Amino acid sequence: MLPTILSDAICSLVEGEKKFAFTLDLHINKEREEIVKYNFVNTMINVKKNYRYDTNELDNPDVKLAFLSVKNLNKYYKYVDRIENTHDMIAYMMIMMNYYCARFLKMEKTGLFRSAKINQAYDPPEHVPQEINKFLKLWHSFGGQYCDYKNFESHDLLELDAYVHITSPIRRLPDLLNIIIIQDKMGLVSLKGNRKTFLEGWMKPESIEYINQTMRSIRRVQNDCNLLDLCSKDDTIKDKVFEAFVFDKIVRNDALYQYMVFMPEFKMT
């Protein structure tokens, strides 16, 4: 994580303030819903309005137009199962940005890639919903990890030949490293001085392994914090009934059964 003065102010897209942004521009043929050209650029933007997920974003005509465009694109460039709300729209655009950057970095033979290998021996039940099917594949996969170009593999869960994280440089170190690399390779910002020293230090094999270890620890803490946050904000949550899926039944040494439980509404186990 970056210091608060950077993450909440200087580097954050604050409403009404001018900010620099690394941008993927798409040129789309409306008749064929085809991406005919794309390019990466450094831009200066001014955020007119910061929207939140719990507001009626689709009431805004510009947001609605973007939503409909993404929904159509997903028919031909399918990165998510469906586009039903602005959550899905943002997820789609983030995956697309990450993938297009990964393709460029792959050609340049550099970058910090994100790989995820599926356990091909595991076959999920046929009767479960698509979301549960995907979760079970993820649960029984060999896990995702960051790796350099020499060791990178495909992202099987997204069904993409290459993938990087680059859309969240404020909250994830790998995204920041990839932005430094890609902007240097594109001639947008030169790599020198402290910038070069910082990148070289974090791209060492032992540093990448440290990133992988700390990311796993952070995810465990995040899950616990999310659960505590839910319970602290809603006193009635303990009285509600939620849909859940039980899996991975095992018999313990004391002859009792132990299960794993996944709750789709909270995306928690």
Predicted regions and their residues:
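Electropositive polyanion-binding surfaces
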Residues: 1-269
